[in-house]
Design a protein with these regions (language model features):
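Glycine/proline-rich, positively charged
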Residues: 58, 104-120
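Residue-level signal for alpha-helical context at structural boundaries
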Residues: 96-97, 110
Length: 120
């Protein structure tokens, strides 16, 4: 999809839009949570996940949710190419502060320090 057709498809998406708070940023009324594209629900087909992102954008979804804890950073890395290719149409929501340990998948700690926020 080239930039011209991407702009046209986003503009003709079927979702209503809303403004995020007082920011003035317009987003589709439905967002896409991307957590399952990196873990929690079994093996991920990255080509299928990318096709899902592209189709969601075509339908007017402009808000995509991720977090550094999803796949221990994999989710944000995976989304980076999609966001870069569609930057003018995409609003990215993220979260931070949850710490996991590689040797203990059930462990959840918290770090809301300014240093962790900047690093995440």
């Amino acid at each position: 999809m080239n930039d011209a057709s991407r702009s046209e498809s986003v503009q003709t998406g079927t979702l209503a839009t809303t403004t995020l708070g007082t920011s003035g940023i317009e987003v589709g009324t439905q967002g896409l949570g991307c957590m399952g594209m990196s873990e929690f629900y079994g093996a991920t087909d990255l080509a299928e996940a990318r096709a899902t992102l592209d189709r969601a954008l075509e339908l007017g979804v402009t808000l995509f949710d991720t977090a550094d804890v999803y796949g221990s950073g994999h989710n944000e890395e995976f989304l980076s190419d999609f966001v870069r290719a569609n930057r003018e149409h995409v609003v990215l929501a993220t979260k931070f502060g949850i710490i996991r340990k590689a040797d203990d998948p059930a462990y959840r700690g918290f770090d809301n320090s300014p240093e962790y926020i900047r690093a995440s």
